[in-house]
Amino acid sequence: MLRVDDLSVRYGKKLVIDHVSAGFKPGRIYGLVAPNGCGKSTLLRAMAGTGNGRAEGAVSVDAGDCMGIEARRRVFYAPGEGTLLYPGLTAADHLKMARGLWASDVDLARVAAECRVDGFGRKRVRSFSQGMKQQLTLAVAYATGARYLLLDEPMNALDPTNVAVQGELIRKAAAEGGCVVLSSHILGNVDELCDTVLFLKDGKLLRYSGEPRSAGELYRKLFG
């Protein structure tokens, strides 16, 4: 399990994440929902140990400290908008680098084919459309073999075909014993994919546990 206990994150004097505690179990898909600027990316980065705010509290991976290299390799944070990628490297370069840094044994040809990046594996990122960058970012996440995938707006810039493809790959990752935490503004995808939906409001995580409702309905109730 990936756990956060009493986690707070500040940027200067601004408290963005306010004493959050939660557990994320393998085999499940979690949705993280909030308006822009409410701290979704900040929380995901803090969970992966890659944030640049001032963090307090604890993050643990499978009951161990998250600071060791082996624990860190079990978690991967994939930011949106292609910011993970290097313009001068090819798609194939990125996949090889991810597998090497995370010491995984993932079949890169399979990942490239599943994520539909095999057709532009030798092209450099600087020539990619935004949708191609997003496809590659997600392929990089799978190439790491990390158990816990933290995906920040993973469906942004994808066309409907690739949204469906990534939905199936996210389900597959969970079915094979992984855990996926995804932030999204596409609330229909949240309803379709996620076992649990968490809302971030005023720095606090809220988990809905009443009768089944759509993420959109709950969003309107919480945020207007």
Q: Which residues does each PLM region occupy?
A:
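Conserved ABC ATPase "signature" region
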Residues: 96, 105-121
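The feature captures the beta-strand-to-loop junction immediately N-terminal to the Walker
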Residues: 33-35
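Conserved ABC transporter NBD signature motif
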Residues: 49, 53-71, 207
